[in-house]
């Protein structure tokens, strides 16, 4: 079984130059522009059962005489917010380590917040809170749990965890679509490692798109609030005055890294769909209409020679179409102004994308649109990113020889649940992504398995750990 006989240092200066150039000018810029999805095995047969259904704002308000008394909201929501530690090993590596070794690592810890979604232990947080973690701890009620990472969705910056516990105080659910600008909201989290901190503010805006998500298909329709949110609040709860969840605290706009008046939360209606999909399918189901829209405004109207003398620029402008895609087949054309999706007004790109985010591949939707000043309607069938109407399911490969489970990612093949075999012998870390083997890019997990089961000879394994730090391996299989 032991075919690995040693780890050897490279010795050619050309290899050093090539590794340095490829790392710094090709790979790392790509990694800085993208966000990697991470998952762990789970069973997807049963949907999430919520213990506290949406209340639709029908809980009696607080008896307090003051409109700015948030004690009811705090008392209801604080028990449902947890403290999260993300533990990972940070390696220090330079291209010279290809020659001389010398990589070092140390344990690092970052913290954030999470919200208990169900009484049986499902917790939602931000993807950026746990994306580099090799181990995740949930601190709740003076007890520390090791959490299982069920799945993440970089397109919304959300992640789902699971702890082994029952009868937890699940958060009450409100409706972000019913939330009004100017309404009071309360942010609950653990800023600067201060547990159960409560701040209050109002809803400053809805449907904000601020360009912070680096996924290929980002969905940004944030709730903006002036409630103070600081480092450590990420993944915490944004609730209304009744203590019902309306958003997951996610980001701030700041030049200092601390609160300066602008904070943003993922709407709860989007969050619930993401959680349901991850638990049931292992991945989030995204539905595409086969085109790209931009905001409809004066400048874009001029660009498409549209009438600029209109009372208001309501809707979104169809910029481009995928040939033979759903929108193309439905008769839509670039320059059309989409005003409604299934009767719901969409007056911004973020509103349009949010409306589609609730849909599934195979769903039929009706678009109302303007062409030459005339209103029209058309119905189309949404598809997945592969162009079919099938639901997407996560696919995991296992190999006793490698001693790990594998799955395809945007960058290569990720190895996780490493329990033995070659990868354990080599000391490959959990959530290591294989980018290339013997300088050939890899994308298919089965190809990796076949290689390790059949190949004999020297192997150059190039990849990155969960912190996206490059770690190469050089060894021989016999």
Please describe what each predicted stretch is.
Residues 3-6, 11-16, 20-334, 340-345, ...:
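Serine-dependent protease modules
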Residues 78, 396-428:
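Extracytoplasmic/periplasm-facing segments of secreted or lipoprotein envelope proteins
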Residues 154-157, 410, 468:
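Short acidic/glycine-enriched loop/turn segments that link adjacent beta-strands
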Residues 335, 431:
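Conserved catalytic motifs of ABC-family nucleotide-binding domains
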Residues 378-380, 472-476:
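Edge beta-strands of extracellular beta-sandwich domains
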Residues 443-446:
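A conserved acidic, glycine/proline-rich C-terminal tail/linker
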Residues 460-466:
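Short, exposed beta-strand-loop hairpins at the edges of beta-sheets
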């Amino acid at each position: 079984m032991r075919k690995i006989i040693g780890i050897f240092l490279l010795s050619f200066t050309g290899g050093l130059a090539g590794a340095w150039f490829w790392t710094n000018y090709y790979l790392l810029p790509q990694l800085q522009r993208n966000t990697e999805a991470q998952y762990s095995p789970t069973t997807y047969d049963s949907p999430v059962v919520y213990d506290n259904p949406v209340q639709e704002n029908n809980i009696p308000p607080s008896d307090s005489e003051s409109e700015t008394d948030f004690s009811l909201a705090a008392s209801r929501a604080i028990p449902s917010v947890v403290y999260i530690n993300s533990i990972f090993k940070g390696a220090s590596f330079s291209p010279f380590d290809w020659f001389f070794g010398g990589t070092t690592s140390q344990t690092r810890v970052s913290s954030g917040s999470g919200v208990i979604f169900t009484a049986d232990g499902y917790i939602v947080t931000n993807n950026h809170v746990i994306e580099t973690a090799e181990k995740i701890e949930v601190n709740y009620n003076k007890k520390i749990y090791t959490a299982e990472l069920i799945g993440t969705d970089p397109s919304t910056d959300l992640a789902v965890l699971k702890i082994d516990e029952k009868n937890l105080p699940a958060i009450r659910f409100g409706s972000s679509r019913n939330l009004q600008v100017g309404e009071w909201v309360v942010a609950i989290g653990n800023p600067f490692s201060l547990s159960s901190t409560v701040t209050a503010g109002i809803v400053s805006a809805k449907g904000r798109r601020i360009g912070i998500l680096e996924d290929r298909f980002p969905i940004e329709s944030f709730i903006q609030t002036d409630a103070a949110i600081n480092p450590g609040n990420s993944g915490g709860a944004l609730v209304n005055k009744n203590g019902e969840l309306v958003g997951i605290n996610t980001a701030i706009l700041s030049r200092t890294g601390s609160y300066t008046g602008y904070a943003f939360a993922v709407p709860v209606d989007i969050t619930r769909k993401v959680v349901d999909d991850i638990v049931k399918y292992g991945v989030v189901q995204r539905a595409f209409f086969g085109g790209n829209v931009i905001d409809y405004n004066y400048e874009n109207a001029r660009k498409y020679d549209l009438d600029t003398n209109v009372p208001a620029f309501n809707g979104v402008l169809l910029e481009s179409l995928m040939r033979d895609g759903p929108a193309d087949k439905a008769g839509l054309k670039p320059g059309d102004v989409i005003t409604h999706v299934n009767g719901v007004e969409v007056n911004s790109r973020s509103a349009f994308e949010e409306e589609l985010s609730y849909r599934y591949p195979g769903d039929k939707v009706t678009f109302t649109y303007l062409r030459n000043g005339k209103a029209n309607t058309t119905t189309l069938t949404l598809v997945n990113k592969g162009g079919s109407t099938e639901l997407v399911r996560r696919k995991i490969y296992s190999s006793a020889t490698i001693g790990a489970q594998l799955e395809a990612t945007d960058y290569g093949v990720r190895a996780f649940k490493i329990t033995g075999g070659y990868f354990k012998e080599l000391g490959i870390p959990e959530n290591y992504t294989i980018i290339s083997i013997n300088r050939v890019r890899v994308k298919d997990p089965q190809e990796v398995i076949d290689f390790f089961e059949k190949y004999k000879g020297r192997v150059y394994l190039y990849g990155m750990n969960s912190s996206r730090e490059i770690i190469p391996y050089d060894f021989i299989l016999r």
